[in-house]
Structures are given as C-alpha cells and as structure tokens.
C-alpha cells in the first residue's frame, strides 16, 4: 500500500491491517481504505488528493485544544495558557496553564487560548457492583392474562416485583429500543430505529391513565381488540391492535408539551412521516431528508394529530418504565432493571434521520471474517463518526445514554469493543472487505462512566469474541463488568474451565440469545435445527459427534467439581453415597436415563450450580434454560428461515412463579448469593468498600471466541 495512504489512514484512525481470529496479520485492500476515508470526509481517490489531505492533517496544531476535552477526576492537564472553566452548576474557576485535579464531575465549558471547548470531567471508576444474581429476560416472550399477544411493561413490573421478593438482584432485558411504526414491524431488537426512545409495542394498554378515564363503552371496544397469544409472536398483529386501541384512548389523555423536548418532537415527527412515507427516510422525497427542512415543518403541521399521538406514546412508556423501576426498588433489588444498548441503529430510522450530522453516511457496521463466519458479518447498522462526535461535544452519545439510564439500575453495552473500534464496511463492499475505525475510547468510556455514575447504574460490557486486551483492561479499570459464558469458558484443549477460574469482573451466564439454550445443547437441538436450515459447514454426523463430545466435556467438568449428582447405582458401585453435587443442586438423588446417563434436568441444575460457584460479580439466569425450552431466541445467519425474536416462553408469568424447576434454581442461587444488608437499592449509588475495586487481577478468563452474529 502507498506510504502516503498509510500515513493518511493512520492520521484519521483507519486501520490498514488487522489481526484475525487466528492471530495472523491481514492487509486491508487500498480501495477499502480509500472508501472508508471518504466516509470520514477525506478525499484519497488520487495521489494528489492524498498528498493534499496528508498535508492538511500534518498542519493541524497538536498543541491546540481539541473541541472536547475529557478529563478523569483527580488528574491534571496542561493548557496552552490561562483560561476560565464555566462549571455546570453556574460557577466559574480561573485556571492558569493547567486544568486542576479537583474539578467537579460534569459537563463544563473551558475558555482558553481564544477558544471555547467542552470540558467533561469523568469519574475514575464506578462503585463496585454487588455480588448478586438475577434473570435474563426477553420481554416480548412473557405472557400473562392481561398482556396482548406478547410481553409488556405491566408483565415486567409484575415479574420484577416477584423476582425481587425471591432474592434476585437484577432483571436483564433485551433492548427496548423503538422501531418504525409502519408495517412490517421489525422483530429484531438489535436493529432499532432509535436507541433514544422506547418501543410502544411494550405498552400495557389497560394501565394507561387514558384507559381509566375512558367511558365504559370505549373501554369495551378497546378490550375486544386484545389478540390472543399464538405459537409465535406476531408483531404486526399486536401493533395493529395496540395502535388502534391507543388511538381510541388518545382523546382521553392530556396534551404533551412538544416544546419541552425538541428531540421527542423530532422523533414523533419522524414517526408521523414514516406512517405516510415508510420506515426508511432515505426513500422519502428529498425535501424531507432533514428534520429542519421547510417541507418537514409543513407536513408535520398537516400531521399534527399523529405527531402528538406518537409523543404521547413515549410519555406512556416513561410512566410504565417508572413503575417497573419502582417495583425493583420496593423489593430492595441491589441492581434492579438492566437495560441493553444495541451496538448501532438502522440507518434509515429515526436516529439516522435526526442525527445524520454525527453519523457516517453509507457505512455498514459488522465484523471481520472468523472461524464461524468466514465471509465476515454485515449487520447493516450505522456508525458514529468519531470526528463529528468530538466536534459536537459527544452530545448525541450523552443524550442516548441519559435517556436509557433514567429507567435503569444497570446498562449492558452490546459489542462494547465498539467503544474502541468498529468494523466499517464501505458502500459496494462485502462484509469481509471492511476495516476497523478507531474511536477515542477514553472519551467514550469516560462519558459512559459519568452518565452511569449519575444514574447510580452498573455497567456490563459484552466483550465476548476476539476483543483486544485493552477492552478488558479498560472495563476493569473503571469497575465495569465484562461477560463470561459457560459455553466459551474453555481451556486450550477444549475442556470446560472450572467455575472457580472464571473471571471475577464479569456477568456470568450459561448462554446468550444467539447461542443454544441449556436444554437445546443437551439434546442436540442446535445441531438438528442448523442442519435443517443448511447452516452447517460440515457433515451433520461430524457436528453431532462434536456436540456429543462437548456434552461429555461438560459432564466431566460438572462431575469433577462435584456439581452433578451420581446415580444411586453408580454411587453404590463406587462404595459410597451419592456425591456432594446433590447439596449444591438441592437434590441429593440424581435421576438417570438408560445407560446411567444423568437426567437433563439434573444437568441443567448443575450448570446453574456452576454459575453459583463462580467468583463472577453478577450471575444471569435465562428463563429459556430453566423452563426447558430447547429453541434459542435468535439464530444468527437467518432472517425469515427461523422465528428469531418471536418465541414465547412456555409458561406465563403466573406459572413461572409456581414452577418447581424455577423454585429449585431460585433456592440454589439465593443460597449462594444472599442479599447483603449494605446493598444499595436499585437506581442509587453504593460506595465501594476498601479493597473492593475490580482493578485487581481476575482469575483466568475464558478462551477468545468469535463475535456472535446479530440478526
């Protein structure tokens, strides 16, 4: 590659090579580098253009203040001269050649050397998360006597209140991000129209003030619209019913002040326009491509009732999420509800329209080739432009975090490595023909820490896959948790790692939404369905043999750790009683299959006993695992071939509360992780005890695994 192009790419944070999952150096094609530089507004299409752009990059005064300064509390920073800090609270501080280490946390302004820049003072670290356990929940999968064909925020409040009374410390949700209002309704929560607003599909119609205020005849019409639960969740049917019901109730609601929240007004305007023109703003008439365009104002006036309606839906979402937070707080949950932040957005959605100035237009975020995805992955998501974020004081990033965290006791950040770098695929290129673009990780992580600190929230980064060591170190240094998954906790020879060696600085789980459930793994369902969908890269017999070997490796680890009870016959032959696994699992005698194989139910309990035996700060339990569901929520590599994000749980909220298998797991984990008397209620900030910081060395972590696919 031309040296000038390499230097230009380096100056703008664009990688010209990367290390693949086999730790081999891979050179990026020059045309990819040129294409990605173009997405950053840098012309590199000719030698002359490269020379001009490189000269401009080298002419930048490196001693000048950047547009945004992110300073960690307790640290100082040299300045080019005297200045004044205008504090967030209205105060002012004169500074002379250096930013002092005692500035308060927050968003300030610095005037120095003839410039005014944003100054963000961020915490060194968050308080250490409590040692507790909780449920991982795909909210759409819940059902109850009052929900309409899918789980809703009323179900979540009920479930959270019950979980808190049984000793759970958290409930981790799928993303509740907004999707487009036009049909077909998007099922994937990881490709949202907006990460700043909530999907009104999750509203409980009967819990709204407008329903209570409506006359009996209107309520009867609304009640008759309720769809029944089906074998699969039909988002279009649910949205059609709920939208009609809420339209009937809207006249009974007080008006929403759109001037109080310009971002909400713009989002509601996008929703109204999307109903008229479709969910992808890029296909709208050109005069509607910018929120401030005169044609947008004209059509918003024509659609004033629809704009008001969609703004009202967001107010309802806020009210019902507040009720969920109250349910967690009332039971003393030390963490509470943990929301999930998707790695990106649908570029044609509301955020792509409203935040276009800070997004790289035309880029598609994905992942490079790996052992599981040899052609790479194209998630079709938009990406922040790192230069524009800095130029605008990270305002869009901050506001996104604030809107999510105001209802959260914790935040899971999907693909947290994206705060360091993202795989950009330029227009016209295949998923493997992208490259990494670097972000200011200190700024991204620091601002996340500041907003989480203010919300009293814990942070969990999804750092599975081939992530750089800097990611794990960065999370640990700020008391943010990583992720560990039993399936990936392996030694180099493929043996499962004993739970005592799992990382302390982590949320530990058996599986994820992209992987087989515990019952599905034990029965080989993951092989059967992938064979049926033509997703296997090898012969099905080979895959079955691998799955059987993996099962035996798992059983060997559970037996070695005395977590799996032996059968009575096996114990008698060994000259002793059934072993100690019964204690951990709460069942002294093991059921067995023909041939002495342990019962799958006992194995699932033992797998949860492994979670309980780990040093990991947080433990996450999936209802799919505990209720015996063999189908996984999402099958990477499929769209319509598999019912992704549409599988209801096999039990209702009421049935979950009395299910013997659920009770067994609750008893096991509550005994292993009893509530600490000093735990802070959900939504408040606890103070870490001395020596309780997470920056110390963790036990051995898990083997690097490829990035999980995203549908």
Spans of model-derived segments:
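Alpha-amylase-like alpha-glycosidases and glucanotransferases acting on alpha-linked glucans and related
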Residues: 182-318, 344-571, 596-618, 624, ...
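Carbohydrate-interacting/catalytic domains
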Residues: 1-173, 208-216, 453, 458, ...
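Acidic/aromatic-lined carbohydrate-recognition and catalytic surfaces
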Residues: 38-74, 86-112, 118-354
């Amino acid at each position: 590659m031309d040296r000038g192009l390499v230097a230009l790419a380096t100056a703008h944070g664009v990688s010209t090579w990367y290390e693949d999952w086999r730790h081999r150096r891979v050179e990026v094609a020059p045309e990819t580098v040129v294409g990605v530089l173009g997405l950053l507004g840098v012309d590199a299409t000719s030698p002359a253009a490269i020379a001009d752009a490189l000269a401009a990059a080298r002419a930048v005064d490196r001693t000048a203040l950047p547009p945004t300064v992110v300073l960690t509390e307790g640290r100082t920073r040299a300045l080019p001269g005297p200045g004044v800090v205008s504090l967030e609270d209205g105060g002012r501080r004169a500074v002379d050649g250096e930013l002092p280490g005692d500035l308060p946390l927050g968003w300030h302004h610095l005037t120095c050397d003839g410039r005014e820049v944003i100054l963000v003072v961020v915490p060194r670290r968050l308080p250490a998360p409590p040692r507790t356990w909780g449920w991982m929940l795909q909210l759409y999968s819940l059902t109850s006597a009052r929900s309409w064909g899918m789980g809703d925020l009323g179900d979540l409040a009920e479930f959270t209140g019950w979980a808190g009374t049984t000793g759970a410390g958290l409930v981790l949700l799928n993303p509740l991000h907004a999707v487009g209002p036009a049909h077909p309704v998007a099922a994937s929560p990881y490709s949202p129209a907006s990460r700043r607003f909530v999907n009104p599909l999750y509203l409980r119609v009967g819990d709204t003030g407008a329903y209570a205020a409506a006359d009996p005849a209107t309520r009867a019409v609304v009640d008759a619209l309720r769809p029944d639960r089906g074998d699969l969740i039909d988002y279009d049917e649910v949205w059609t019913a709920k939208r009609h019901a809420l339209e009937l109730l809207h006249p009974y609601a007080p008006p929403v002040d759109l001037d109080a929240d310009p971002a909400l007004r713009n989002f509601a305007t996008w929703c109204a326009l999307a109903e008229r023109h479709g969910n992808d703003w890029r296909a709208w008439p050109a005069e509607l491509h910018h929120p401030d365009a005169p044609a947008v104002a004209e059509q918003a006036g024509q659609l004033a009732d629809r704009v008001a309606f969609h703004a009202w839906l967001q107010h309802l979402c806020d009210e019902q999420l507040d009720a969920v937070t109250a349910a967690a707080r009332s039971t003393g949950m030390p963490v509470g509800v943990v929301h999930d932040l998707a790695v990106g957005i649908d570029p044609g959605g509301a955020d792509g329209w409203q935040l276009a100035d800070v997004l790289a237009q035309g880029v598609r975020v994905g992942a490079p080739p790996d052992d599981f995805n040899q052609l790479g992955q194209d998630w079709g998501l938009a990406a922040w432009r790192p230069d524009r974020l800095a130029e605008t004081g990270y305002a869009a990033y901050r506001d996104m975090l604030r809107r999510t965290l105001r209802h959260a006791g914790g935040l899971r950040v999907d693909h947290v490595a994206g705060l360091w770098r993202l795989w950009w695929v330029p227009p016209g290129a295949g998923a493997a023909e992208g490259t990494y673009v670097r972000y200011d990780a200190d700024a991204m992580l620091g601002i996340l820490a500041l907003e989480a600190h203010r919300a009293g929230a814990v942070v969990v980064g999804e750092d599975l896959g081939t992530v750089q060591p800097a990611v794990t170190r960065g999370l640990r240094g700020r008391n943010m948790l990583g992720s560990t998954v039993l399936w990936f906790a392996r030694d180099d020879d493929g043996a499962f790692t004993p739970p005592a060696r799992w990382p302390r600085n982590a949320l530990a789980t058996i599986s994820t939404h992209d992987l087989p459930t515990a019952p599905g793994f034990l029965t080989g369902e993951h092989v059967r369905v992938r064979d049926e969908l033509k997703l296997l890269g090898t012969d099905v017999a080979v895959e079955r043999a691998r799955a059987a070997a993996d099962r035996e490796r798992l059983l060997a680890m559970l037996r070695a750790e005395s977590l799996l009870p032996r059968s009575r016959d096996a114990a008698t032959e060994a000259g002793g009683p059934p072993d100690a696994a019964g204690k951990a699992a709460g069942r002294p005698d093991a059921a067995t299959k023909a041939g002495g194989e342990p019962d799958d139910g006992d194995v699932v309990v033992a797998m949860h006993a492994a979670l309980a035996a780990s040093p990991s700060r947080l433990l996450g339990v999936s209802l799919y695992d505990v209720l015996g569901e063999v189908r996984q929520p999402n099958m990477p590599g499929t769209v319509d071939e598999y019912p992704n994000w549409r599988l209801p749980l096999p039990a209702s909220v009421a049935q979950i509360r009395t299910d013997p298998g659920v009770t067994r797991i609750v008893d096991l984990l509550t005994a292993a992780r009893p509530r600490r008397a000093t735990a802070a209620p959900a939504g408040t900030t606890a103070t870490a005890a001395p020596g309780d910081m997470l920056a110390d060395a963790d036990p051995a972590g898990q083997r690097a695994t490829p990035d999980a696919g995203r549908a």
